[in-house]
Amino acid sequence: MQESKQLTPLMRQYNDIKSKNTDLIVFFRLGDFYEMFDSDAREASRILGIALTQRGGVPMCGVPYHAAANYISKIIKEGRKVGICEQVGTGEGKSKLFERKIVRVITPGTVIEDNMLQSNVSNYLVCVFTDKKGWGAAAIDVSTGEFWVTEQADDISLNGLSCMLAALNPAEILLDKITLDRVKSSMMIPGSVATTIVPREESSQIPSNWPSQSVWAGKKTALTCALTAIKYINVNEPGFKDLLIPFYKEISDYLALDENAVRTLELVSQNGARKGSLWHLLDFTVTPMGGRTLKNWILNPLLNLADIEKRQNCVSNFYDNPLAYEELKVILADISDIERIMSRVGTGNAGPRDLAGLARSLAVHGALKNWFDKYGAVVPYLKENILSKITVIEDLANLLNSAIEPNPPIKISDGGIIKQGFNAELDDLRNTKNNSSKTLAELCEREKAKTGISTLKVGFNSVFGYYIEVSKGQSGKVPFSYTRKQTLTNAERFITEELKEIEDKILHAEEKILRLETSLFDSVRKHLAEHIGVMRSFAKAIAELDVYSNLAHCAKVYKFTKPVIDESNILKAADLRHPVVEACLPLGSFVPNDIDLGGETQISVITGPNMGGKSVYLKQAAVLVILAQMGSFVPAASAHVGIVDKIMTRIGAQDAIAMGQSTFMVEMKETSHILASCTPKSLILLDEVGRGTSTFDGISIAWAITEFLYKPHGGGAKVLFATHYFELTDLENKYKGIKNFHAEVQEYKDADGQSKIAFLYKIKEGAGDKSYGIHVGELAGLPATVIVRAKKVIKDLEAKKGTSVSKKEDDIVGDLFSSPIVEEIKLVNTDAVTPMQALQMILEWKKRINS
Ligand SMILES: Nc1ncnc2c1ncn2[C@@H]1O[C@H](COP(=O)(O)OP(=O)(O)O)[C@@H](O)[C@H]1O
Ligand SMILES: [Mg+2]
């Protein structure tokens, strides 16, 4: 940065502002542009892909102010915060320098503008604090007004927090240094999320519009989080504070999905995109609220049987009543994002189009009432809920309908927002404006007749405004009531009281119209704001309607059936499918499979070749549970789901490498988390656990994990373990509740007599017998020479060992020590190695044996 004495006043002003807002990218208003300087400019030019220029040696880049929203949204999506610095003074006075200040801070967690948000995604600002034994959190979606808090006093390992963050996928997180360190070390926050260090707001002063003291008893950390978050929002968007009222939510009311499960099951995104996810597959919702609610339900399946059945019944009723669905869809199509519009109404940020959208949305009240008259029994509890609000909705709809033009301009200042007939004064002003020439012509005729001056005419100039002009020759006839304004060579100009009044009306009509429209618009907005509570719960009910009918539609489209749900330990389904994988394959080519866990079998060990369908089989079990417990039908011929409390998965290690830990370390961390926190009600998916280390290590660990999870007298978590360690199939012989399955393949000879395999994707009882690795390698296009060589090696190995490499042995330990290293020793051509090479080989073997 330059020495301050060399700086221009402007740059000094900039530096001053920037130094107080180091964590913001400052959008510094200069005329029609927002300029960024220095490090901000470098960062912004990279994020926005715009050119970097210079100003007095300082890097700089800029964007036109009218297109700023687009650029701001890009910066926010990178997890950065933007400070909007506007010219606030008049720019007069000695310095001629506009006074400037930050008028608004836009952060990823506090945006409300539609064009900076994704319509069907909640945008959470989360505040988290840990304490000695547990943690508390507040989650706020400022754009919709959703605000809840929770606390777990007894969760030293922060497992619950990790699950919660995985489900919320926050846009921004507030925390203190201690919490940040703990959360970071356990990799709970992806790097792209904005984190802000804030001091704890440890007041016991609860805002008067919040739930009473008793709710917060023993919820100190949760309250601190709520107060801290509100304080932060209040600084950035002061209007919000009173609109946000928290409720306490017990996290343990929902099925816990760990971070690995949310990601690898591809519930709401696949490699970062919505497409390819379960949510995308299921989403036929019509309203933005419906889309968000669906996502929310997928990530937060229920645990309470009665609650699940309540949802299931609604879905079932829609399923049985296709007409109800069709007719509802038409009504919902007119409803825009009421939740987000109401947030902007509440903060005074709503524009004309917001209110026009609201008008259209609320205009459905009549159709909705009719629909409930006809189909109310489909959603009994929503009927009461919505009908109890319908008079308020109707009143507001009438107000909006009479007040707001259906297709108004974007900005209030463009005018033409308030409808004709809404306000007499406004109509009058508009008439005045429109009739100005007529009124003047009338005045002119009247004055001519009164004075008998035939040359009298009415004119206008910018200096004197409206005037009456009389030619010099006739000026003698001018009455006393005229006031002379100007004398020309052959004419005199006058004004009269009446002309002045008309002039006033005309000249100021436009300005008055604008002012009046603005104030009328504001009063409508304020009136709406008084009903924000009703409107929000109306929006919520609409969202639920949307999701129920949507799930019924999915059941039809994807051929789902209604599962039996109870409190048992059973997880059983016939002809179960993975809906997302199925949708990607040609029609009818997905192979359904049965599953039966929790009865005789506690743990299934599934072996089989790569690409055999093991992982898909594991995942579809989890998807079954999630769908069932969110209230949906499921992709199976029949299904019985005993309520599951947690789904924990250890699938695919590759992606975590990016976060800076070794694959194996990540794998073991996640596995230890599973072992530490599973309960008899949990479903655990272990996919190739142990792959990240040497074979011996891997087998031993996988073996020990399975034994750990096994509960000989029942009451163990349900486990599906896919593995390519054939050795694990021995567990079946030792433990009654462990059962072997394999992904079936068919071996056949092709035209050239080469043996090939076909994947059948059928998961069958019993251990398979071979690892088909070489065949898979062949299918994957390994060079023929490699395949031939591999086949030769395996043949030699088998011949030398006198048995198949992967044959079962009674004692797994014996099997281990008869394997790879011994085989390698046997293979060494002692005539062809130098003593040095031999020594190196021995060292290498020793290392592997000792590792
Ligand atoms: N039940 C099935 N029916 C049809 N195709 C399947 C089935 N299961 C898996 N597949 C196909 O096989 C591929 C590999 O499946 P996957 O479960 O990943 O194999 P594995 O885990 O055994 O290596 C999938 O991407 C899918 O295209
Ligand atoms: Mg797999």
UniProtKB/Swiss-Prot annotation:
Gene Ontology molecular function: any one: ATP-dependent DNA damage sensor activity
GO BP terms, alphabetized: mismatch repair
SUPFAM superfamilies associated with the record: DNA repair protein MutS, domain I (SSF55271), DNA repair protein MutS, domain II (SSF53150), DNA repair protein MutS, domain III (SSF48334), P-loop containing nucleoside triphosphate hydrolases (SSF52540)
Gene3D superfamilies listed in its UniProt record: 1.10.1420.10, DNA repair protein MutS, domain I, MutS, connector domain, P-loop containing nucleotide triphosphate hydrolases
Binding residues for ATP: G608, P609, N610, M611, G612, G613, K614, S615
Pfam (any one): MutS_II
Keywords of this entry: ATP-binding, DNA damage, DNA repair, DNA-binding, Nucleotide-binding
GO CC aspect terms: cytosol
Record flagged with keyword ATP-binding: yes
NCBIfam families reported in the protein's UniProt record: mutS1, PRK05399.1
Role played: This protein is involved in the repair of mismatches in DNA. It is possible that it carries out the mismatch recognition step. This protein has a weak ATPase activity.
Protein family (similarity comment): Belongs to the DNA mismatch repair MutS family.
Protein name: DNA mismatch repair protein MutS
Lineage of the species this protein comes from: Bacteria, Pseudomonadati, Elusimicrobiota, Elusimicrobia, Elusimicrobiales
Gene that produces this protein: mutS
